[in-house]
Structure formats: C-alpha cells, structure tokens
C-alpha cells in the first residue's frame, strides 16, 4: 500500500501549483478529479491484495492486464499446501444470458450432484498424490487437477485500476464467485481510501 496514498495523490495532482502543493486538504481535489474523469492522478498510488480463490476464477482475474500478479505455482509446490479442493455451489444455466446463472436447482438434486463431484475430486487428488509418489514432476502431475483447485494470488494495481476493476466486476454478468471476491476487495478499498470511496458514492455498497 502506498503510504498516505490519498495525501500523496493530492500532492502530485497539484504539481502545476507548487505554492499550494503541500495543502493537506485533498478531498475536494480528488472528488473533482473523479467527477471529471481526470484519472491519471489515481495512477500515482498502489494497493496489493492477497486473494484466495480457485484456478477457474483466477483465470478471470488474471485477464485484468493493468495489474501485476504473483500466483502460487503448481509447478514448484504441492497443491495440497493450499488445502482441500472445495466442492462448488451449483446453479442452473440462464437460457437467455450466457453470462448468468440462476440459484434454482432443487436442494435434493444439488446434494446428489455435489456428492458425485466430491468423489470425483477425491479420485483426482488421489491420482495426483500417486503421481508425485511415483516421481512424476509437479508440473506434469498438476494436469489431473480440476479448475476448482485452490490457488493464491497477489494482485497489485494503481488506485485507478482498482476503481475500474471494482466497478466492472461488481456489475451483472460477473460470475458469483468472482463477485464475492470483489465485495471483499471493495471493503478493503473503502477502508484504505475513504476520500475516494466518498467521491465514488461507494459508502453503502
């Protein structure tokens, strides 16, 4: 996290007004910049967030190319270090919107299917462990693992990138599991950047 990030952005934003550059009052200035789309100043401060997710959702997150990432490597480390593979929630496909799913699968059906998934995952991790015991390289053994396998990401970006990422991925059409992550990230952002949060009208989101 950039120390005193909002104060730093305000200081840099006043680069052309050196007589007033050290003015600690930055709320109005940053609010003006957000309102009028002067985004470059928000590239002057950064935040890093640790994210625990699955390989399937990580692939969506890694598409945001304005960020830099460091991810747990299944080539170099045993995947068991991050815990058991979680059985996913099950939702039905929205027939009108391919980017949407509906939480309307009957409970009995969900339980039956999740039991099958749990058995499938158990067989997959047993095979992975056997391959490792047989001396197969981790970079090869990992190919038997499902997209639900846990992973850990460190995601670093400018305040500008975080604002647009949170706006985009909070919207309808983002997968629920990804939206859950964004809600947690937004809570962190609100704590660390209260002035920006107020200007963005995110206080009650």
Segments (PLM) and residue ranges:
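Family-specific signature for flavin-dependent thymidylate synthase
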Residues: 1-205
């Amino acid at each position: 996290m950039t120390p005193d990030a909002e104060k730093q952005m305000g200081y840099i934003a006043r680069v052309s007004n050196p007589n007033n550059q050290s003015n600690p009052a930055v709320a109005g200035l940053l609010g003006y910049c957000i309102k009028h789309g002067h985004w470059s100043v928000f590239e002057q401060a950064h935040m890093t967030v640790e994210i625990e997710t699955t390989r399937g959702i990580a692939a969506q997150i890694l598409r945001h190319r304005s960020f830099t990432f460091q991810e747990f490597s299944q080539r170099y480390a045993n995947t068991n270090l991050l815990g058991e593979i979680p059985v996913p929630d099950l939702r039905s496909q929205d027939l009108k919107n391919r980017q949407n799913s509906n939480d309307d699968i009957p409970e009995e059906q969900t339980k039956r299917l999740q039991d099958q998934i749990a058995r499938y995952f158990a067989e997959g991790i047993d095979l992975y462990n056997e391959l490792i015991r047989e001396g197969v390289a981790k970079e090869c053994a990992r190919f038997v693992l499902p997209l639900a396998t846990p992973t850990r990401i460190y995601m670093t970006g400018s305040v500008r990138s975080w604002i647009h990422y949170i706006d985009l991925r909070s919207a309808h059409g983002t997968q629920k599991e990804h939206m859950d992550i964004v809600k947690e990230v937004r809570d962190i952002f609100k704590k660390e950047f209260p002035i920006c949060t107020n200007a963005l009208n995110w206080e009650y989101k």
